[in-house]
Amino acid sequence: MTAPTIAVRELSLRFGSRVIFDKLSFDIPAEQWISLLGASGAGKTSLLRIIAGLAAPTHGQVQASDGRPLAPRLAWMGQKDLLYPWLSVRDNVALGARLRGERVDRQRVARLLEQVGLSHCADDRPASLSGGMRQRAALARTLYEDRPIVLMDEPFSALDTLTRTRIQTLAAELLTQRTVVLITHDPMEACRLSHRLLVLSPPPGGIDDSHHLTGKPPRAPDDPALLRGQAALLQQLMRANG
């Protein structure tokens, strides 16, 4: 499947009299990583769920550039790995196919486990894995779905710094040629992985896309351009939150 551009137009979300965000319009370019940042409660996860078709906006629409439905072309990776504890790592990777009653491509599972460095524990249960290994298994499961659009809600936030850096690099390498939207609270992570940044202001929220990144992700953690971008983004986040 070819990754489309996602167009968000005049999107509003209200809960009773409370406005979460109002008339958001922006594009998510095809085959790029986009990071969505903002304070807690700004509506980042709600916005991602609307893009995924898991929630309805009060007003507005989300469309693909080719006019085809988005939902069948989406994969989701969240902060929690959501591995089934009674299944092996191998069976967790192919969980989507199992739930849909499809034949499991075992060669593809084996190839993905090799790519994420988990071939040696394919028959193990999740309880025996470290946090980083569990997230690598979740990444392999996301890749098995082979969707052109991947939505990620803070998938690396619970990991230690070194493990997070390694898995960021792995995800960036394995999710090339896909449209990726990543929610993160970490300016370093956003600047390291993204082609473009979107900052969501607190309610009633707006979108600020004025921050520009140079170079190609994933950027080295000591890249001077990344460090400058991180500082500028932190200032932008502070402005967005008053």
Where are these regions (language model features)?
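Conserved ABC ATPase "signature" region
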Residues: 104-121
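Conserved structural motif at the start of ABC-family nucleotide-binding domains
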Residues: 6-8, 20-23
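A short, proline-enriched helix->beta-strand linker immediately N-terminal to the Walker B motif
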Residues: 144-148
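Helix-to-loop junction immediately C-terminal to a conserved catalytic motif
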Residues: 52
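Conserved ABC transporter NBD signature motif
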Residues: 59-74
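Conserved ABC ATPase signature
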Residues: 125-129, 133
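The feature captures the beta-strand-to-loop junction immediately N-terminal to the Walker
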Residues: 37-39
